[in-house]
């Protein structure tokens, strides 16, 4: 099954760090805490049968809930360790940029793609369901069928 994701070797931060994925995730959590946020959940999941794996970080800032699910990119050379480090490094740098934006624009605007909708999907999962092909099914939110509608309220 093709995930549609690029190879890790073709993306920034490939084999640029010796730090463990855990250390990058700890740095990422400190960024969230620095904004006054609260980390709710974190995890790593993999599906040996499909080869898909991803990191997940769920957090709350000022009453809004967010969930980052970041795929580990496939490696041409099957270097899973380097791919995991790269994924955790990318999460950190993505979050760092969004935290800077949040200071000016607010957390919901900055982290909008990770904002949790009432049905449990994030804004990005709702708008680009194809991304679910690149992550383990355990982290993928259920997708709506054609014509289905979710009623829900946005809490301000």
Identify what each model region corresponds to.
Residues 17-20, 26, 48-97:
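Long, continuous compositionally biased terminal/linker segments
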Residues 1, 69, 73-156:
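Intrinsically disordered, low-complexity regulatory regions enriched in serine/threonine/proline
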């Amino acid at each position: 099954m093709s995930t549609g994701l690029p190879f890790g070797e073709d993306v920034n931060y490939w084999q640029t760090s010796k730090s463990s994925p855990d250390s990058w995730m700890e740095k990422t959590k400190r960024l969230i805490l620095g904004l006054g946020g609260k980390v709710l959940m974190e995890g790593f999941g993999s599906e040996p049968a499909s080869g898909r794996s991803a990191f997940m970080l769920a957090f709350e800032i000022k009453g809004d809930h967010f969930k980052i699910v970041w795929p580990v990119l496939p490696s041409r050379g099957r270097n899973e360790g380097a791919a995991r480090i790269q994924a955790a490094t990318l999460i950190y740098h993505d979050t760092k940029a969004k935290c800077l934006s949040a200071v000016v624009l607010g957390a919901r605007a900055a982290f909008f793609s990770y904002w949790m909708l009432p049905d449990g999907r994030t804004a990005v999962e709702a708008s680009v369901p194809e991304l679910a092909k690149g992550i383990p099914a355990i982290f993928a939110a259920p997708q709506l069928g054609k014509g289905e509608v979710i009623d829900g309220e946005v809490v301000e």
